[in-house]
Amino acid sequence: IDNLFSSDKREQINREMASHLVSAEPGVDEFDGKATRRTGALVARSPGSRELIMDPTVLDVAGKALSHAHTFQLHCTQVISIGPGSEAQPIHRDQWAFDMFPFPAGFDTTFATMWALTDFTEENGATRVIPGSHKFTNNKKFSVEDTIPAEMSAGSVLLYSGSLYHGGGINISTEDRVGVIVHYCLGWLRQEENQYLSVPQDMFKDLPEDLLRLMGYAKGSY
């Protein structure tokens, strides 16, 4: 979706997360990226990010994508900065986070969003996707050559199923590629990011009830 959030909102999130991103250690392997920095706990650290998490258009699509369960919840939040020289990330599915459990084909457990804080280009490491691969089985093997770059301008958002094969691209530019990921999962699954610990309880008074429920302070099923 092009131009879903404003330049003012991008600047706010960049300000709020700058110190956390600078202090984050680069990854230690090819999956996390040795020139890639990640930091999470966006509900607590970035009030601007809460608007992305609660965006009504995104929540509507996520609800439809995960409609085979009674509820869905916030799964993971991160700012990811792919630096110059980063290698391509191995192609994967996000829902492999659940110990590689072989969920039935077509049964999505997560729904993902990638919000562009900078332009996403093929040169700076735009997320690479394999359209239609959410229908494939778990034993498929792919390389970067099988993918296409999800190029988009800053302020846009990429939506995709947790069963879609994808990966971060190689950054051959001189600039960082920075994005916010917000993932949602079925209400009865354990979240990848523990929202109960990442958000101090003394902040609850400042958070709307619908956000608290999305964080997991609600029934996990019916």
Regions found by a protein language model. Give the residues of each.
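Conserved double-stranded beta-helix
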Residues: F136-L159, S163-L164, G169-Y222
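Residues that flank catalytic or metal-binding motifs in active/ligand-binding sites
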Residues: R15, R38, R45, H75, ...
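Non-heme Fe(II)-dependent double-stranded beta-helix
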Residues: D2-P102
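A structural signal for short, well-ordered beta-strand segments
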Residues: C76-V79, T113-W115, V180-Y184
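Catalytic core of non-heme Fe(II) oxygenases with the double-stranded beta-helix
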Residues: S86-E151, L189-V199
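Short Ser/Thr-interspersed hydrophobic loop/turn segments at strand-loop and sheet-helix junctions
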Residues: V79, D119-F120, S163-L164
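Short hydrophobic-aromatic micro-motifs
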Residues: I1, W115, L158-Y160
